[in-house]
């Protein structure tokens, strides 16, 4: 039987359908309120508003649960690889062995970008931020695929594959250009993560051998960042896509949103904060500063808009961080890790943070891992974009397949 919520406005009662979720909270359908009640709902930041129905990702922030297509994020991070998770998000189920092989071959086949794109890179000054270069390059792909300016349903899957394949190449090119080194072409004999590391760190005169511990760590990072419900950048991609904009333009809007320090740039802010603290002996001082409303200092890497429990991604990354630093001989002498571990221990016992449910989030340890890998801080958000492209494309595809979706137009 259908359930309804009652909304009383100026003495008149309106019955609003309650939509049953397959998992998680039920939802009150307010889509007819403006037409029937002659008023709108007001929800700054969409704190209590669902903009779509989605089966891609589920989060229970109170319990610290994150699932992709029903699979727990910890299981995926430990037992899967990034392209298998990409297939899961795009198609809705894990691939068979044959499907996985075909998918990885297609991604490898489309990893090259048009050579004319090199001219675009040359228009940027050498000090340009890699995110600025990447943003322009991804948007410019529209010029190389004019047939997708008027895309069809038959184009969805190939478009997703092209995007997943080309973003790492563009990301590595952005980095190489920013440091004045020649571009390195993709090597299709390598898997997805190895290939990206190869394009980042190889040079024409030296071969780069990928450390398997580093590769596995980056694979986990990519999986952990692949999708996260209707966050700012994903919502931006959906809003752009709702107008019928071509997929390259949509993904470039997601990159722009991700670039914001409150979204994709948070792990770089964590590194800067740990450097500012400087030593474990100063942690109590900075804890006090974080509690002081009049002090501009903020404890970065703690708290999350959705999670009111320990971010499950942070738990995986904490152990991954230790594995990487142990492999590199830095486990016992990395000052940033020591400060981070002690800061977390102190904060989790402090009533101020406990009452406010401020737990470490995904950004708290990822920057330390990147830094240990030799990835500079200006590339942190670029790597986030590589991973999140999978989620953006899954959500973009789902949006276009949803008959209820309309052009987004907030009031």
UniProtKB/Swiss-Prot annotation:
Pathway: Carbohydrate metabolism; tricarboxylic acid cycle; isocitrate from oxaloacetate: step 1/2. Gene3D superfamilies: 2.20.28.60, Citrate Synthase, domain 1, Cytochrome P450-Terp, domain 2. GO terms for molecular function: citrate (Si)-synthase activity. GO terms for biological process: tricarboxylic acid cycle. The keyword Transferase applies. Keywords: Transferase, Tricarboxylic acid cycle. GO terms for cellular component: cytoplasm. SUPFAM superfamilies: Citrate synthase. The active site is at residues 304, 363. Its EC number is 2.3.3.16. It catalyses: oxaloacetate + acetyl-CoA + H2O = citrate + CoA + H(+). CDD domains: EcCS_like. It holds the Pfam family Citrate_synt. Coiled coil: none annotated. Citrate synthase is found in nearly all cells capable of oxidative metabolism. PANTHER family: CITRATE SYNTHASE. Belongs to the citrate synthase family. This is Citrate synthase. It comes from Rickettsia japonica.
């Amino acid at each position: 039987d259908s359930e309804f919520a009652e909304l009383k406005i100026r003495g008149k009662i309106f019955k609003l359908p309650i939509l049953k979720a397959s998992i998680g909270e039920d939802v009150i359908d307010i889509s007819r309120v403006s037409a029937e009640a002659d008023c709108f709902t007001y929800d700054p930041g969409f704190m209590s508003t669902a903009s779509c129905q989605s089966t891609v990702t589920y989060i229970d922030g109170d319990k610290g649960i994150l699932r992709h297509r029903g699979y727990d994020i910890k299981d995926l991070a430990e037992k899967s690889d990034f392209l298998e998770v990409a297939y899961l998000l795009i198609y809705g189920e894990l691939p068979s062995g044959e499907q996985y092989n075909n998918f990885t071959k297609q991604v490898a086949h489309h990893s090259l970008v048009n050579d004319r794109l090199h001219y675009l890179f040359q228009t940027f000054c050498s000090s340009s931020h890699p995110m600025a270069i990447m943003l322009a390059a991804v948007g410019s792909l529209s010029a190389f695929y004019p047939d997708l300016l008027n895309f069809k349903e038959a184009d969805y899957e190939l478009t997703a594959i092209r995007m997943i394949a080309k973003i790492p190449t563009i990301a590595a090119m952005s980095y190489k250009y920013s440091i004045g080194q020649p571009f390195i072409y993709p090597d299709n004999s390598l898997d997805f993560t190895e290939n990206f590391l190869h394009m980042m760190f190889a040079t024409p005169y030296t071969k780069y051998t990928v450390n398997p511990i580093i590769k596995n760590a980056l694979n986990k990072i990519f999986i952990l960042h692949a999708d996260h419900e209707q966050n700012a950048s994903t919502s931006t991609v959906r809003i752009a896509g709702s107008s019928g904009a071509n997929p390259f333009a949509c993904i470039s809007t997601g990159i722009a949103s991700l670039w914001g320090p409150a979204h994709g740039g948070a792990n770089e802010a964590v590194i800067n904060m740990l450097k500012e603290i400087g030593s474990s002996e100063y942690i109590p001082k900075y804890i006090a500063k974080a509690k002081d409303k009049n002090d501009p200092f903020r404890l970065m890497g703690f708290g999350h808009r959705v999670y009111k429990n320990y971010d499950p991604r942070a738990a995986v990354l904490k152990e991954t961080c230790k594995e990487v630093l142990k492999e590199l001989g830095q486990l016992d002498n990395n000052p940033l890790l020591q400060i981070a571990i002690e800061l977390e221990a102190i904060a989790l016992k402090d009533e101020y943070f406990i009452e406010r449910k401020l737990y470490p989030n995904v950004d708290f340890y990822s920057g330390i891992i990147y830094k240990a890998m030799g990835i500079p801080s200006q590339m942190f958000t670029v790597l986030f974009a590589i991973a999140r492209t999978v989620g953006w494309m899954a959500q973009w595809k789902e949006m276009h397949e949803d008959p209820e979706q309309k052009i987004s137009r907030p009031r």
